[in-house]
Amino acid sequence: MFWVNGLPQTHVPLGDRSFQYGDGCFSTIKTKKGQLEHWQAHVERMEACLTTLQIPFPDWRTVLDWAMSATLKDESAGIKIHISRGCGGRGYSPSGVEGPVVTISNFSFPAHYLAWQERGVQLGVCETRLGIQPLLAGHKHNNRIEQVLAKAEIDGTEFADAVTLNVQNHVIETTMANLFWVKDEKVFTPGLCLSGVAGVMRRKVLEYLQSEGYSVQVADFTLTDLLDADEVWMCNSLLGVAPVSGISAPENKIDFPIGKLTRRLQGNLNT
C-alpha cells in the first residue's frame, strides 16, 4: 500500500520530478512489530542526500507519524520512504517547485533473507561498472539505473546478487548491499567517495567494530583483494548482516568459511 504525504494513494502526478528525473532520495527501513529500526540514522542519511540535492527537509516528526501508521505489525517487515522534490519547474530547473512530496510504502519481510543469514550468499561479479560521481557518491538518490542494469545482468543466473566494481575497477558493493571482509584479522571495506551507496547498516557495522577496538581500513580495493579474504559479509538495513559463502569471478571461484566475526556481528546487529 502507498501513502503520499500521509494520504492513501494509488498514483503519483505525472509532473512529479522523481518520476521525471529521479529528483529525490529514498531509504528502506526494517520494522519490528510496527517499530522502525535505526530511525535517526535513516533521517541523517536522507538529510545528507537532500542537502546535496538542495531539497528542503520535510517535517520529520510528521513523516515519522506517517511511517508509524504505515508499518505492518508483523514480527519483521519493512517500509520505504521516498522523497521527491515535488512537482513543477521548467525542464531540469527546480525553480518554483512546490514540495517536497513524501511517499511511503510497506512490504513483508523477504523470507529468503533468513536462509541467507544462516547459510550465506553465493555472489557473482557484474560486468556492469558503476560510474564516478563524487558529488552523489554515498547517497541513495532516486536515480538507480546503474543498479537496475547490474541486477538485470544477474537475473536468470545462478546468483542472487553480485559484486559491482566501478569504472576504475575498484570493488564498491553488491547490487543491493555493502561489503566487508577480514584478512589476517584486519577488517576492510570499500571507500565510497566516488561511487556506491553508504548504507545505514554499513554505518552500524562500522560503529560496532570501532566500539570493539577494531581498526577498519576504508580505501580503494581490487577484486583480487576481495578474493584473497579470509571471511566476507554483506549488509543492508533489511537483510542485516549475512555471510558471503563464495564469489564466482570470471576465471576464479573462491569459497569462504562463515567467520566468527560475521556471526558476532549478526548476534549484535541482526534483530
UniProtKB/Swiss-Prot annotation:
It catalyses: 4-amino-4-deoxychorismate = 4-aminobenzoate + pyruvate + H(+). It comes from the Bacteria. GO terms for cellular component: cytosol. CDD domains: ADCL_like. Keywords: Folate biosynthesis, Lyase, Pyridoxal phosphate. Its EC number is 4.1.3.38. Its cofactor is pyridoxal 5'-phosphate. PROSITE patterns: AA_TRANSFER_CLASS_4. Pathway: Cofactor biosynthesis; tetrahydrofolate biosynthesis; 4-aminobenzoate from chorismate: step 2/2. GO terms for biological process: 4-aminobenzoate biosynthetic process; folic acid biosynthetic process; tetrahydrofolate biosynthetic process. It holds the Pfam family Aminotran_4. GO terms for molecular function: 4-amino-4-deoxychorismate lyase activity; pyridoxal phosphate binding. Involved in the biosynthesis of p-aminobenzoate (PABA), a precursor of tetrahydrofolate. Converts 4-amino-4-deoxychorismate into 4-aminobenzoate (PABA) and pyruvate. Homodimer. Belongs to the class-IV pyridoxal-phosphate-dependent aminotransferase family. This is Aminodeoxychorismate lyase. The gene is pabC.
